[in-house]
Amino acid sequence: PATANSSGFSAYEEDYAREQIAQARESGSSIVIAYLHYGNEYSRSPNEYQVNISHQLIDNGADIVIGAHAHVTQGVEMYNGKPIFYNLGNFIFDQSNPATHRAYFLNLDLVEDNCTVTLYPVNIINYLPQFMSPEDGKALIAELNPQCDELQVSDAGTGKLTFKLGNTTNKTS
């Protein structure tokens, strides 16, 4: 494991995550984003472990959970009024599997206690993300959206979610 003085990995521990979220809130953070490297490679659906961890993080006060690792996109879920982006897909890899050539990135607009997240679908071509056509973008967002009715799709092929910031779900309060 990583320590203050040596490199390594930081395995998920709910108590430690709860403390970090609380510290962020106490220090005045207006938004808490949990970014995790988790999930099964090349699986288009989040596994039970991902779902459980993501729900715990939201329950403990995170505003957004963002995942990476699977090399493919996974679903989006609204849980207790907060978004979970299980896997964004690839950005710097250019693998031979066509499923790994699709990804999306997020833009967050923060206004007071409101957050609007815009999803921009991209294709990875020669290691470079290229915006998808509106039709392809709509198709990708439709794949992400069965778990998330709140995810709106624009004519331009982007997605949009709006939600309230702040800890409204913390079970420890």
Model-derived regions, located:
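Acidic, metal/ion-coordinating pockets
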Residues: 1-173
